[in-house]
Regions:
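Short, hydrophobic/aromatic-rich segments at coil-to-beta transitions
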Residues: 5-10, 103-105
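Core dinuclear metal-dependent hydrolase active-site scaffold
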Residues: 20-23, 96-122, 126-127
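Metallo-beta-lactamase
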Residues: 1-3, 23, 27-33, 46, 113-149, ...
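Short Pro/Gly-enriched beta-strand edge/turn motifs at strand-loop
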Residues: 1-6, 78
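Active-site HxH/HxHxD metal-binding segment of metal-dependent hydrolases
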Residues: 14-15, 28, 33-107
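Active-site-proximal loop/helix segment associated with metal-binding centers of metalloenzymes
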Residues: 15-17, 25, 135-136
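Short beta-strand-initiation
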Residues: 6, 15-17, 92, 114-116
Length: 149
């Protein structure tokens, strides 16, 4: 059986964030669109349609671009935890998300936030949001609970 590997592209956002795009053929999945403009620029430059949005947690630097993206791609589903108002599909530990011939396992990884999610694509690529930072662990806040970690 032929396995097609998607292209994964980081898009810098703000001063220290990344928005992730997973693309295959003429479609893309966007993870944590904190800003819409760089995502729209990339999609238009590459002739892509936005098929899905996956959100790791409810902080604005990961969600602020959702509304504008939905204006351009109105039928695009948004996957995330129940505390994300824009989520059209609530995902929990053990769920999976299907897209084209790919599957992402959903992990509940509380710590940075109580309802944080990570997505493991095809058992190979882990999208952690703020559970992990580049060259280090993610940040927790004073109101974080030890049982989250």
């Amino acid at each position: 059986m032929l396995t097609i590997t998607p292209t994964i592209t980081p898009i810098p956002a703000y001063t220290d964030n990344y928005i992730w795009l997973i693309r295959q053929h003429d479609q893309a999945v966007c993870i944590d669109p904190g800003e819409a403009a760089p995502v729209l620029d990339y999609l238009h430059a590459h002739g892509l349609t936005l098929a899905q949005i996956w959100i790791t947690h409810a902080h604005g630097d990961h969600t602020a671009g959702i509304a504008e993206l939905k204006q351009h791609f109105s039928g695009c589903p948004v996957y995330g935890a129940a505390d994300i108002p824009q989520a059209t599909h609530i995902v929990r530990e053990g769920d999976s998300i299907a897209w084209q011939n790919h599957r992402a396992a959903v992990w509940h990884t509380a710590g940075h936030t109580a309802h944080h999610r990570c997505y493991l694509l095809n058992q190979q690529h882990l999208f952690t949001g703020d559970t992990l930072f580049s060259a280090g662990c993610g940040r927790v806040f004073p109101n974080s609970r030890p049982q989250w970690l």
